[in-house]
Amino acid sequence: MESLTLQPIELISGEVNLPGSKSVSNRALLLAALASGTTRLTNLLDSDDIRHMLNALTKLGVNYRLSADKTTCEVEGLGQAFHTTQPLELFLGNAGTAMRPLAAALCLGQGDYVLTGEPRMKERPIGHLVDALRQASAQIEYLEQENFPPLRIQGTGLQAGTVTIDGSISSQFLTAFLMSAPLAQGKVTIKIVGELVSKPYIDITLHIMEQFGVQVINHDYQEFVIPAGQSYVSPGQFLVEGDASSASYFLAAAAIKGGEVKVTGIGKNSIQGDIQFADALEKMGAQIEWGDDYVIARRGELNAVDLDFNHIPDAAMTIATTALFAKGTTAIRNVYNWRVKETDRLAAMATELRKVGATVEEGEDFIVITPPTKLIHAAIDTYDDHRMAMCFSLVALSDTPVTINDPKCTSKTFPDYFDKFAQLSR
């Protein structure tokens, strides 16, 4: 297996422009495909997850033109749900942002579909979404294990009315249903059961739907009403924000070993909840400065925090490795959904933090981290999880090297991450 050893870094300083957000890119591509009119998407992320969505859209009869650098895409909207005459199999890798929204969207029109992916995708739950879609008369069957992909979907349309959806495992189930609801056969009301996790990701969904001309009435995240008679209309141009989760590594690096790092492509008005990572970093002692389209982080004396990270679970992973440089014991709480991501991130994070010398307590939905007096050089396993690889790059900000196994797994969201990280390192 390929590995990459990062030597100790003395100083982190400079400017980095973020690749487009994965969450925004795949949502916008799907809505552009369903909308009437042509949409020109700029700053699109070029990564595995986006490629899986684009490949699926091609098979579904959507025409688009992709620039040579793959960051600008002109999508010719269908102006309706997908209609296919031949049975189709769509392979979606490990892209939850493609699997969940497409599973809902393919129920709307006509066609016979199988949705499948990599082995890890078959371990990632989708039952709560399927249950909700079935309430709206969707025809879906599990081909292997109950509640998990692969799925067979017969497109027959989604009925109007009220459905309940469990929000406690992943917000992607609600996102998927919300994006399909305007093309259902009438007014749709979605009632949430349990505590809705990752609410900021729902805000992203609602914001993008609004840009494509659809209004959703949000009753305090407990009930969502999608009035009848709406359809998606291209906004013409659509700028994909920089990926706020990807910003977290550079901001944390500056907090630990700045200098200062300026991250461009997101700012104080970002629609992504993961910009709240900077607030958590500030609580630890970093200096943070906000602009309209940038964030600057500077080094500070870092202290441990004990916080609920339910709203920003992806960026919270970066706090786990930042905790290695903080005084005291850090607790990251209410992150059960780490267990159903690209890998079981609670187990993986605990295992790898212990390798570098940390004392770790792992609970069902929390992790508590006490740093060692000196970090140990270890080979970090990444579990085919892009965020594990990027989080553990921060270990090199000590006086100890770190070896990252399978560094190319960052291609899921940030193919040139290690190049960008090296450019800022002194």
Curated annotation (Swiss-Prot):
3-phosphoshikimate binds at K22, S23, R27, S170, S171, Q172, S198, D314, N337, K341. Its main location: cytoplasm. GO terms for cellular component: cytoplasm. Gene3D superfamilies: Enolpyruvate transferase domain. It holds the Pfam family EPSP_synthase. One of its GO terms (biological process) is aromatic amino acid family biosynthetic process. Pathway: Metabolic intermediate biosynthesis; chorismate biosynthesis; chorismate from D-erythrose 4-phosphate and phosphoenolpyruvate: step 6/7. HAMAP family: EPSP_synth. Catalyzes the transfer of the enolpyruvyl moiety of phosphoenolpyruvate (PEP) to the 5-hydroxyl of shikimate-3-phosphate (S3P) to produce enolpyruvyl shikimate-3-phosphate and inorganic phosphate. Belongs to the EPSP synthase family. This is 3-phosphoshikimate 1-carboxyvinyltransferase. It comes from Vibrio cholerae serotype O1 (strain ATCC 39541 / Classical Ogawa 395 / O395). The gene is aroA.
